[in-house]
Amino acid sequence: MADAPDGGSADARVDAEPSALARASMPVYVGGYLALYGMGDEGELVLTREQVARALPPAAPLPINIDHASACEVGAVLALADDDAGLFFVGVINCPQLADTLAGVAHPAFFGADAPSLTPRERFLYLVSNYLPSVSLSSRRLAPDEEADGTLFAHVALCVLGRRVGTIVTYDATPDACVAPFRRLSPRARAALLANAEAARAALGDRAWPVPREALAQTLLSTAVNNMLVRDKWDTVSRRRREAGIAGHTYLQASAVFPLPTGGEGPERTGGRERAQKSAVAGGVCIALPVAGGRARQPELPPAPPPPPPPPAMSAAHQAGAASAHPLPAGDYVYVPTAQYNQLVVSQARGAAMTAAPPPAPYFLPAAAAAAAAPPPMPGWYGAAGAAPWHPGYGFPPPGLESQIMALAGAIADGRRVQAHGADGSGYDGPLDRRPLAKRRRYNWDHPRGRSGGGDDDEAYYPGEGAPAELPPHHHSPPPPHPPPSHALSKLASAVSSLQQEVSQLRAGYPYGPAFAAAQHPPAAHLPCLPQQYTAPPRVGAGPAQVPTLAPAQAPAQALSVPAVAAAPATVAAAAAVGPPEEPGVAATVDASAMASLPPAQPPQACDPAEIFVAQMMRQR
């Protein structure tokens, strides 16, 4: 065992004796895929089936540690299998100090209402399953022309997130229960794994792997610190579970709620462990999908009986929580947010209604009837002579989105012209802060030249004239450096594309034209309209008649939602092995555990008028 950092032996740092509850919680078994074949791993993380076939069986037993720290070895790998989907392992963990460390920092409310009925082993399984849900295989880095052999695999590490696809593990009290949630594991590999695991466990006997609590605490804290910047950690864990084909797992919750979720009744127990599957849907709609191959999965247990009706005093939140605790029927599901589901239903119904009932034919009046039925001019109407919407001379206003597209196109043309001519080219006056001042502002007032008493100036001063360039340096700060040319053309182009899509959607859903106007504003029948009365006769010869100008009403603001830009995933870097720097062989391995790091510092960018224009326009939409 490695020496302690302060020079004393590690044996002296081990606590006297672990607690009785910690001994009762051991051993536990862990299993999962160390790598999946052809699932998208890149670079040195790629592990082919040919390499695995050459590396099995390993030349030496593979230890299991925490986050690649050799000083925190907590178990060993019992069996490895080359499955059709990937490399699968089954291991044993027997470290009472790990159970004491996790139980000592867990809050009593973590286990919820089921805390009195949980055994010490189940408590440890909940803690370790949610703190270290992933696995990382450390392999030796091969030379360009080197072939894999039995020394390829170095060790297996329990971690928060693995860099390889589908590397989620399950912890349980027996090897059989540990392997059961993996639905993609072939029966041949399952039988071989269980047989080899039982034989290896019998050979090990009651061996334990004691670790100093200080080393455990330091490693567990470093795991939390190095992964605190991981974005959407539990979403990634859920995706990795689906990639590995895990279904019906008990202890991995992947929930944002602090305590463990509780059901309406006590969970059913089979063989000393909990088999009730806890699942909750928050703010979403669960939609069942057909199972591939036409076969439905059979549930492991019959559905639990419905809970008793809640008392009248129970709040709506409690009723919603009790309803969400019901077990879902077997099958594959997709969780859709309620708002998006309602929007899909409304759009589907609207499309069906428009298809079933096409817009009515346009309504046309004869020339004489149209002249008689046309109402007098009203404020806000478009068209010739202030006609009503159903009048033949009515001109429909252009959509507001088309005006925005035209403005965007003009901004793009200006940006291209600036890039083509440069800062000193023709047609470019320079940035606003470098142009001569056009007027004097009240809050920038200073004494006119020749009147301040600070010196004589022969030049004449005229109101409204800007200050010349030869003013003393204390009047104005030196001009800032010329900003770089605009780089927002791509953003403007994407905004134009999105606006064009919205225009096409609006035209498809709400067509403009006489047909639409006739449907929305039918003509008022049997309402004769008298000619407009004037208070005084118009004067002849007094000049041309003044035609009243009517300001067009603004088009209604379009309330279409713009698709949000997906956040870029957090940059994941390889985690260095935790241990003394002088330990040999650390740099020669490939550790597949993830660690989130801070993004590189971005230099401040100059203010871009095009970006400001796009931001202001999008904010008003």
Curated annotation (Swiss-Prot):
Region (Disordered): 258-277, 295-322, 420-497
InterPro entries for the chain: Herpes_virus_sf, Peptidase_S21
EC number(s) recorded for this UniProt protein: 3.4.21.97
GO terms under cellular component: host cell cytoplasm; host cell nucleus
Keywords: Host cytoplasm, Host nucleus, Hydrolase, Phosphoprotein, Protease, Serine protease, Viral capsid assembly, Viral release from host cell
Region (Interaction with major capsid protein), start-end ranges: 601-621
Biased composition regions of type Pro residues, renumbered to the chain: 300-313
Bias type Low complexity, positions: 487-497
Motif (Nuclear localization signal): 439-442
Stretches the record annotates as Interaction with pAP: 331-350
Pfam families named in the record: Peptidase_S21 (PF00716)
Coiled-coil residue windows: none
MF GO annotations: identical protein binding; serine-type endopeptidase activity
Biased composition (Basic and acidic residues): 266-277
Residues of the active site: H68 (charge relay system), S136 (charge relay system), H155 (charge relay system)
GO BP term, example: proteolysis
Free-text comment about domains: Region of interaction between pPR and pAP is called Amino conserved domain (ACD). The region of interaction with major capsid protein is called carboxyl conserved domain (CCD).
Family assignment from sequence similarity: Belongs to the herpesviridae capsid scaffolding protein family.
HAMAP family: HSV_SCAF
Name listed for the protein in its UniProt record: Capsid scaffolding protein
Organism of this sequence: Bovine herpesvirus 1.1 (strain Cooper)
Lineage: Viruses, Duplodnaviria, Heunggongvirae, Peploviricota, Herviviricetes
Gene it is expressed from: UL26
